[in-house]
Amino acid sequence: MPINIPKNLPAGEHLREEKIFVMEEDRARTQQIRPLNILILNLMPEKEKTELQLLRLLGNTPLQVNITFLNTATHESKNVSKSHLQLFYTTFNQIRHRRYDGMIITGAPVEKMPFEEVNYWQEIAEIMDWSKKNVTSVLHICWGAQAALYHHYGIGKIELSAKCSGVYSHVITDLTVDLVRGFSDLFTAPHSRYTSVSIDEVRNHPDLRLLSYSEDAGVFIVQSKDNKNIMITGHLEYDATTLADEYSRDVAKGIDINVPVNYFPNDDPEKEPMNTWRAHTHLLFSNWLNYYVYQETPYEWDFVDEIEYHI
């Protein structure tokens, strides 16, 4: 089934070239089915790349999906044009009266800062509080995952001595959980971060379930026991070359950075990396949309009534 995107969104052309079924808003209105409404809070600096990565995954399921892109009002993005934000993004005040079937909160390049020192933290915290009643399930990625663990569950982050960057092997703690249904016993996933969280704090928290971890990269997939929040500390959505692009960027800036581990053939940055995590990425997003969003959300679920809105 198609993914419904805003008219003239640049990612649409790339998705069509990849044979992913997309529809623009005008055509989607004629479909006599109830689509899923997904809100994406895109905090990544290169927003158009992240849009394409996420839409590629959301568009590869049997479900019709409507997408709303959300941008922070309290922080001005520097790596995307104002016209792009005006055309394709909205702010929290414009959508807070609505309900959404699912929501994605991306990573952000602010992980070394204490949460309260991030200039849009209060806005992020308000959005996360709002999501408790107005979103069926929220998928948090990298910094977004750490922000959720901190805000909802009181688990702080730990600064690492060196950047965790590369493709790591992971195990599943419980293959019967719907989110990881169909996963292999051992699978790979990319990480790109300077901070982590305590695996013991996650394991011992009464409201959380540790679903996947790596001996080298630590906590990977965490699920709240009420299925409301999914936290993924890595970047399953990354393209094959994203870690290479980040590495080249940091080297050009003169940053003392290690070569991403288990990524380049023979650890040679001159060689083309391969994507070894693509299948599990599609599987996780499909499982999330099916088991945690589609099967859990009410059919009539859109606008918040006035009484609940003011609670």
UniProtKB/Swiss-Prot annotation:
GO molecular function list: homoserine O-acetyltransferase activity; homoserine O-succinyltransferase activity
Positions annotated as active site in the UniProt record: C142 (acyl-thioester intermediate), H235 (proton acceptor), E237
Enzyme Commission (EC) number: 2.3.1.31
Cellular component annotations (GO), alphabetically ordered: cytoplasm
Reaction it catalyzes: L-homoserine + acetyl-CoA = O-acetyl-L-homoserine + CoA
Keyword hit for Amino-acid biosynthesis: yes
Highest taxon above the source species: Bacteria
Site feature (Important for acyl-CoA specificity) residues: E111
Residues annotated as binding substrate: K163, S192, R249
Site feature Important for substrate specificity, where: S192
Compartments where located: Cytoplasm
Residues annotated as signal peptide: none
Keywords, in A-Z order: Acyltransferase, Amino-acid biosynthesis, Cytoplasm, Methionine biosynthesis, Transferase
Gene3D superfamilies, sorted: 3.40.50.880
GO biological process: L-methionine biosynthetic process from homoserine via O-succinyl-L-homoserine and cystathionine
Similarity remark: Belongs to the MetA family.
The protein's name in its UniProt record: Homoserine O-acetyltransferase
Gene assigned in the entry: metAA
